[in-house]
C-alpha cells in the first residue's frame, strides 16, 4: 500500500474551488486548480508533472479519465532549462470514462468520449467532440465544432456545440456526496478565469 504521507505531500498544491465535487478516491497530483461546479469522479486521475493544470468551471471528469500535463517524450524531467507549461481547460467540458487527455489548451463545451486519446500537441478549440477510441496525436489546432469519429478518425463539422451537461452535473453534485467522501475545498485568492 502507498505511503499516506507521500500522497498528502503530492496534494499540497491542489486548489478546489467552493462548489466543486471532488471524490477522495480520485488521484490528483501536482499543482492543480479545480473550478466551481466541476465534478471529479472516483478513480479519475489528474496529474501535473510538467506544469500546473487549471480546470475551469462546470467540467465533468468521469471514472478512469486521465488528464495529465507530462513532459514531452524527448525531454527528461530533470532538465533545468525546461520551462513549465500550464495546461488550461475551459468550462463545460466532459471527459468520459477511460479517456486520456494531454492537450495543453482546451476551450469550452468539448466532449472527449470513452477511451479517446488526445495528445500533447493538439489544441482543442470549443464545441469539439472526440469520439470513442479515437486517437489524435498530430500537431494541430482542431477547428470549432469539429466531430472526430470512427475507427479512421474521420472529421466533420457540426452546426451547434454540444449541450452543456448542466442537469447531469446538478444530479451528480447531489448524489455523489451521499456515497463518497469528498476532498475539502481550498479557498484561494481567485477561481480559474474563463479562457
From Swiss-Prot:
Gene designation per UniProt: dctn6
Cellular compartments per GO CC: cytoplasm; dynactin complex; kinetochore
Any one biological process term the GO annotation gives: mitotic spindle organization
PANTHER family with a match to the protein in the record: DYNACTIN 6 (PTHR13072), DYNACTIN SUBUNIT 6 (PTHR13072:SF0)
Name of the featured protein: Dynactin subunit 6
Cited CDD domains: LbH_Dynactin_6
Main location: cytoplasm
Example GO molecular function: dynein complex binding
Top-level division of the source organism's lineage: Eukaryota
High-level lineage: Eukaryota, Metazoa, Chordata, Craniata, Vertebrata
Ribonucleoprotein found in the keyword field: no
Subcellular localization, as worded in the UniProt entry: Cytoplasm, Cytoskeleton; Chromosome, Centromere, Kinetochore
Function noted in UniProt: Part of the dynactin complex that activates the molecular motor dynein for ultra-processive transport along microtubules.
SUBUNIT field: Member of the pointed-end complex of the dynactin shoulder complex which contains dctn4, dctn5 and dctn6 subunits and Actr10. Within the complex dctn6 forms a heterodimer with dctn5. Interacts with plk1.
Alphabetical keyword list: Centromere, Chromosome, Cytoplasm, Cytoskeleton, Kinetochore
Similarity comment: Belongs to the dynactin subunits 5/6 family. Dynactin subunit 6 subfamily.
